[in-house]
Structure formats: C-alpha cells, structure tokens
C-alpha cells in the first residue's frame, strides 16, 4: 500500500493511500506528472478543514463503492442522494460551497454531483425572493426591471394546470 502526502493551502500535510487519493483526477494527474515522491503534493485551493472532509468522503466511497447505474439518468435526479452523502452534505452553507469548489478543483465528479444536487434541492420549488433569502442575495432590480423579466419569462412559469 503506497501512501501519498497532500498539502492543504494552510500547509497541513495529510497522508493517504494512493488509491484513495487518485479518486481525484487532479491528484492522479499530478502523481503521473511528477512521479512517486516523498514531497507533499500542494493543493493551494483547498484548506485543511475542507481537505479533511473531502478525504473522509473519498475513504468512505473507496470502502463502500456506489453501485454503477445509468450515469446520465442519475445525474438529472435530485432525489436519489444516498444516506451517507445526504448526511455528509448536512453542513453550513459556506462549507457546502467550499466542498463544491474543492470537488471541482480536485475533479472528484461524484462529490461534485452530490454537493450540487444538495444545493439544487435547497432551491427547488422556491420563489426568487425565497432563494435570495436562503443565499443572502441582494435584489438589485428595480420594480420595472423585475416586471420586464417576468413578462419575458412567463412562458416558463408553472401555471398549476398539469
């Protein structure tokens, strides 16, 4: 069992099995490019707190692989988040967004999918006003601009007549 050292942006070093670290396409490519080395692989876009959570996620999914399904079909489903992943994503918003950024940077598609699905579920069925409140977004549209946008997009509003 070969170990790899990863260094977070705040200079904390983590040792992890190479096979688990390579769940990240970014890390896998770095290992292939620089070869085996005792020097830690720098991850300047990921803090130690977030890297620790990402590595926990990777360890779990290495030990308990998800069944392979129809990826295209599963990508579009928002209600099929496995229990471990659902619990993993029960974090405060800033942490959830940091996990999304880390999953994207590290190229860990399953983690990116589950964190993005979690955000999608947070806004599903919400009005623009509710979404602004959830994410603390200031409404910088004038009432006239809002009305214009509503008129331009009324074709896509749910009229409740399904």
UniProtKB/Swiss-Prot annotation:
Task: Tell me, in one coarse class, where this protein mainly resides.
Answer: cytoplasm
Q: SUPFAM superfamilies recorded for this chain?
A: POZ domain, Skp1 dimerisation domain-like
Q: Which PANTHER family match?
A: SKP1
Cite the Pfam families for this sequence.
Skp1 (PF01466), Skp1_POZ (PF03931)
Positions of region (Interaction with the F-box domain of F-box proteins): 100-162
List where in the cell it is found. Cytoplasm; Nucleus
Recorded protein name is SCF ubiquitin ligase complex protein SKP1b
Q: Describe the processing and modification events after translation.
A: O-linked glycan consists of linear Gal-Gal-Fuc-Gal-GlcNAc. Not glycosylated in prespore cells.
Q: What other note does the entry give for this protein?
A: There are two genes coding for Skp1, they only differ in a single position in the coding region.
Family the entry assigns: Belongs to the SKP1 family.
Q: How does it assemble?
A: Multiprotein complex (SCF) with cullin and F-box-containing protein. Capable of undergoing aggregation.
> What are the entry keywords?
Acetylation, Cytoplasm, Glycoprotein, Hydroxylation, Nucleus, Ubl conjugation pathway
Where are glycans found on this sequence?
Answer: 143
Please list the residues that carry the modification N-acetylserine: 2
